């Protein structure tokens, strides 16, 4: 998915694969249920994924691991690779298992991996590029979310990703040895779980698909 910079230099995403795990849309973002009917919520979740993948287009590859046909179709339409989520029903750690599967799929061709949340509708391509450049200075690092408790992106350069997403993932990644990156990348930190998160991201400025989906459903 990569290109070149305006001066002809290789972009910071060269040699980097982004992996994004997406659960079934019907099961995603249930904390948005107070403001969206089920079908509308799925539409918004899919729009956020599309805006996130579009913002990551400058990296060497983007792989979306998902069991959801609509998410897979949308990712392919943007030029992303799609991996059918191999995680069995009832797995105790489905998100991290899906990310490890995606990591294994891309490691043969790309040495460096970024696990990115798929709900970053305010993400700007330049923010991700700057974060990747900062991450290159250490083997493993992460960007925390705006609340300081979650993780928006986990970077692994030449080492295993070792994802530990879930409750208090920022602390879990920190304890596992990942270095926290402190750059000013607001769009990279605004992942969406609650109505307040979505409102904050809209104030910051969301991508076209999310803006259209949210506007249509309000």
From Swiss-Prot:
Transmembrane segments: none annotated. Its EC number is 2.7.7.105. It catalyses: phosphoenolpyruvate + GTP + H(+) = enolpyruvoyl-2-diphospho-5'-guanosine + diphosphate. Keywords: GTP-binding, Nucleotide-binding, Nucleotidyltransferase, Transferase. GO terms for biological process: F420-0 metabolic process. Pathway: Cofactor biosynthesis; coenzyme F420 biosynthesis. The keyword Kinase does not apply. Phosphoenolpyruvate binds at residues 151, 166, 169. Pfam families: CofC (PF01983). SUPFAM superfamilies: Nucleotide-diphospho-sugar transferases. InterPro entries: CofC, Nucleotide-diphossugar_trans. One of its GO terms (molecular function) is GTP binding. Belongs to the CofC family. Guanylyltransferase that catalyzes the activation of phosphoenolpyruvate (PEP) as enolpyruvoyl-2-diphospho-5'-guanosine, via the condensation of PEP with GTP. It is involved in the biosynthesis of coenzyme F420, a hydride carrier cofactor. PANTHER family: 2-PHOSPHO-L-LACTATE GUANYLYLTRANSFERASE. This is Phosphoenolpyruvate guanylyltransferase. It comes from Mycobacterium sp. (strain JLS). The lineage of its organism: Bacteria, Bacillati, Actinomycetota, Actinomycetes, Mycobacteriales.
């Amino acid at each position: 998915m990569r290109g070149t910079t305006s001066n002809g230099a290789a972009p910071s995403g060269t040699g980097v694969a982004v992996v994004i795990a997406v659960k079934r849309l019907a099961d995603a973002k249930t904390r948005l249920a107070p403001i969206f009917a089920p079908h509308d919520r799925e539409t918004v979740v899919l729009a956020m994924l599309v805006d996130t993948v579009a913002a990551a287009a400058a990296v060497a590859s983007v792989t979306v691991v998902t069991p959801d046909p609509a998410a897979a179709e949308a990712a392919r339409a943007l030029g992303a690779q799609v991996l059918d989520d191999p995680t069995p029903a009832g797995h105790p750690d489905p998100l991290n298992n899906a990310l490890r599967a995606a990591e294994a799929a891309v490691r043969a061709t790309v040495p460096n991996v970024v696990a990115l949340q798929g709900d970053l509708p305010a993400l700007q391509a330049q923010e991700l590029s700057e974060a990747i450049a900062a991450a290159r200075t250490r083997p493993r690092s992460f960007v925390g979310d705006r609340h300081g408790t979650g993780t928006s992106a986990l970077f692994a350069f030449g080492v295993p990703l070792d994802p530990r997403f879930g409750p208090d993932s920022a602390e879990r990644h920190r304890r596992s040895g990942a270095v926290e990156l402190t750059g000013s990348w607001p769009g990279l930190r605004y992942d969406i779980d609650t109505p307040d998160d979505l409102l904050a991201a809209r104030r910051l400025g969301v991508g076209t698909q999310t803006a259209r989906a949210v506007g249509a459903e309000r």
